[in-house]
Amino acid sequence: MRSFLLLVTLTAALAVSAPAQIPFDNNRNQGVGVTVGLASGAGISYQEILPSALGYRAAVLAWKTGDSSFFDIGVSGLRVLSDDGRRRVYLLASMAWWRRSGEKAEVAFDDEGNLISERVFDDVDDSGAIGAGAGVELPLGPSAAISLEAAFTYWTDSGDLIPAPQASLHWLF
């Protein structure tokens, strides 16, 4: 909770200190990288900021090993509040969906410990999240940036509203 409050405070401080707006910058309106977040999803991501100060980000991650598989897809809508040419402060709305699957074996034994039956079944877990919050994009060099976000997230697994940090690392072009 402390790190979440720190991120909100940092975002608010940067929003106050970065009121200048610059014209749309074609050299930093798109980004490819990685995103990690409960509401935004996790994985390889693409981000684009449009001339209207609206933007979007999509993330996808998938893997399969043996009988197990995992799939995650997330999308975020962004509204830029402030952009001084180096950093952006924005609002975001995100949603993500995960699916984990695998096979489990259920065995039954008699009183003497002998195997009497074995049943294999699919074990599937779906969950989703939807969230809204604020973020800041900070430069890491001439063509790289890190985004730090704080989002209040509703998670379907628990039914709770969770204050969750999110982060992205993007190469801008």
Language model region names:
Residues 1-26:
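Cleavable N-terminal export/targeting peptides
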Residues 28, 144, 158:
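Solvent-exposed, flexible loop/coil residues
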Residues 1, 17, 21, 49, ...:
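Selective for proline/serine-rich intrinsically disordered segments
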Residues 24-36, 91:
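Transmembrane beta-strand segments of Gram-negative outer membrane beta-barrel proteins
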Residues 32-44, 62-71, 85, 154-164:
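Solvent-exposed loop/turn segments connecting transmembrane beta-strands
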